[in-house]
Amino acid sequence: MHTNVTSEILRVLDRNLRDDPKFLITGLGVTDPKGVFGTTLGLVERYGDKRVLETPTSENAMTGVGVGLAIAGYRPLMIHQRLDFFILAMDQLVNSAAKWHYMFGGQTAVPLTIRLITGRGWGQGPTHSQNLHSWFAHIPGLKVVMPSFASDAAALLQASIDDPNPVVFIEDRWIHNQQIDVNDERLKETVKLGKAKVCKSGDDITIISSGYMSIESLKAVNYLHAKGIAAELIDLRTIKPLDMKTILTSVRKTKNLLVVDAGNEIASFGKEIIANTLMSIETELQNKPRLVSLPDVPEPTSYGVIGEFRVSAVKIAESAFQTLCVPTPEDLIETLTPLKEDVPDEFFTGPF
C-alpha cells in the first residue's frame, strides 16, 4: 500500500488538530469540497469551524490575525492555494511576523506557519505560478522550507509547525502525487530545519536543488550515472537556514558545482549558493559553476512555450555535461523527454 504527499500533509494537519487545542488552520478554500488539493479534506467536519477557519479574501488582514493569534499563544497554520495571492500580505509578514521576536528581545515567539502552494500547470501564466522563495529568504527572521519528496514532506511540515517563530513552507503542487510505501521507515524520521539531504552520492559533480526541482534533478542524476558520471545530488529541504556545511563538503570532494533553482535568475537564491561557495571554498574548482534557472521574464501562459521556459531534467543533465566540458550524449532528449504538456503526470487533471 502506498501513500503520497497529499495524504501525508493531511495526516500531519489532522494529528496536530487532534493533539494540540491551540493549533488552528485558516485560509481560503480550507473547508472547500476539494480541500486545498486534498490536503484539508474532512478536517472541518472532524474539528469544527472554530479550528478550521475559512477566511475572507483579505490576505493582509487575515495574516495580521494569524500573527496576533501566534503572539497570543496559538499555533496557526495559514494556507494560500497560490503563493501569488500572498504577495498582498507581505507587510504583515515582513514588518510584523518576521521582526516581532527580535523587536521584543526574544521574549515573544510567533509560531506561525504559512503554507504557500506554487501554481504551475494548465497555463496558469504570469500571476498564478511564480516562484518567489528567494524573496522570502532575503527577510531576516523567517525560515523558508521547500519540500521535495514524499519521504520527508510530512516531517518538514511538522518541524515547521513546531518551530517557535514564523516559517514559510513553499510547496509545489507537482510534488503532491509523489508516492511512497506506507511502511517505509523514512516516514517515521524527524527532520531538523536547516539540514540538507544527500539523495545520491557521487565524486564528479555536485548538483544542488530544492522543491520540485529535486525531482527533476534526480531524473538527471540517474541519467548521468548511467553515462558514467557520478553526480552527487543534494536536496536542500530548507533554503533558510541554508546548510552550507553539507554543500561545501560535497563541492570539496567533486570540485564541480551545478545549482538548480526554480526561480528567475536575477538576484536568485541559486546565485547566493554559488557566491557563498566561491567565498568559502579553499580549493579551486575544476570548472566554473553553473546555474540552471528561469530567464528574467514572466512565466508564459501558452502550452507551446512553457516547456522551453521551465527547468527540466533535460536542461539539468545538459548543464552538467557542459560544466564538466563533456559532449552531450545524442540520446539525452530521447531518454529524458521533456513534458509535452504543462502537467506532471496523469494524476494532474486541472484546472488548478
Regions found by a protein language model. Name each.
Residues 1-166, 170, 175, 336-352, ...:
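Thiamine diphosphate
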